[in-house]
Amino acid sequence: MNKPTTISFHVPPKMWSEFQESMLKSRMFNEEVIGFFFCQRHQVSKRKIRYIPKTWVVPSPDCYEHQSATGLVLTQPFHSFLLENYLRVGLDVVHIHTHAGRGMPDFSYIDDRYESEYAQFISSGFPQKPRLISGVFDEDFQSCQFRMWDRKGRKFEKVQFCNSLFEVATNENDMNNPDLMFARQKIFGEANQRLLNELKVALIGCGGIGSIFAELLGRLGVKNWVLVDPDRLETLNLNRMPGATQEMVEQRWHKVHYVKHLIKRIYSEGSCVKTIPTSIESELARQEIATCDLIVVATDNHFSRKMAQEIALEYMRPLVCLGTHIDMKQDHTPRMYCRVSVPPMGGGWCLMCGNIISLQRAAFESAPAEIHQMVGSVGYIEGVNDPAVFWLNSICASTGVGVIHGMVSGFLNVDSGIDWVYEFPGSDWRKTNTEYLRSDDCFFCC
């Protein structure tokens, strides 16, 4: 018997908080209110479909022709505005409304009749045949039900609603069979450990930082990976990649296969590691990254980080960016930095508008080979690779894993994003005030 298709509607926490606040403010007394999300459909797998919100709208009181505790009707001009600006461009729509009272709400007979007719109307009125998802909440927005109608308005399917960072289904059977390996991590809660075990992580860049990161996050409990890196191991990598050997170099191992080897040493069974020995530009890499719950980029160039950020924005996935830098002052003393950045999921700022990566450098790196060689010395010493040491990479990777542990366990709030820079030998952590990174006109995230 075939498994049923799982349909989910996933809203980032910050976006949901803003939407919920706007809905509650739009209610004057105890009348019903309605809000709209306009979504992109993402076919994650054969049996999993995810609807990703691109924008939301909550009508103001003057947008209603009628509004009471028993129902509501939008004005025709406002409804036409929604149709022309969002459905005609190919987005699907989610209607969210409230019912009076507390506790699990039910769809009413009026809901059934209206939604059935509306699902048929929008699918027949637009070339892209948009789908209707509807959700009903109690008056406090604590309990809800969601469903998606077919295009004829005759049947509907249940939709799972998620407003957390990670949309991960955990195996309830694991509750009764805790893994002894993680006994020393019980303090963080068994539910959080199960979430780590089920989390699917895309790691872009399996070099000096990425390999250490994979070892650390793997030992924390992450077993499901997509590894992306086109490079092979070289002798100059051996000073900073744990477990890498000269024999691997001579056998021309791809870095993704080396990192898979690290993970499989931790989990001889029960892990799933997909290796993609290509650049992030490949369509295969892009498709696989989009299926992951978390994207981590640990590359040494700006172009791949820009690509990772674009994928994270398009598919509404949390992104963690890791990097280090070493240079020499005029008195020949070193300055060493590591940086951990997590842009807010759903917009606000990104790696580009936050100036965490350089679009100019990204353009240089994506240019034809002859131009790339000509400008490659900008910021580099020609003929010499970027300086890198194991211990600095380890600080960066360890902090990145700590941040992810906090995101999963809930003891670190990243709704507004974080940007942390560590400086050595001053041993100083500088935490950027992310309010200064916010942008209202970024080409990428606004």
Model regions and ranges:
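A short helix->loop->beta-strand "cap" motif at the edges of active sites that frequently abuts
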Residues: K129-R131, E269-G270, Y315-R317
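Glycine-rich adenosine-cofactor-binding loop
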Residues: G189-R232
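A short, basic/flexible loop-to-alpha-helix module at the beginning of a structural domain
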Residues: N171-V201
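Glycine-rich phosphate-binding loop and adjoining beta1-alpha1-beta2 segment
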Residues: N224-S268
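Glycine-rich phosphate/adenylate-binding loop
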Residues: S124-G125, D138-R151, E167-E172, L195, ...
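Conserved beta-strand-loop surface patch within small alpha/beta domains used
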Residues: M1-V94, A100-A169
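Short glycine/serine/threonine-rich phosphate/pyrophosphate-binding segments
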Residues: I209-A214, T235, H302-M307
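A structured beta-alpha segment of the ubiquitous adenosine-cofactor-binding alpha/beta core
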Residues: V256-L294, T299-R305
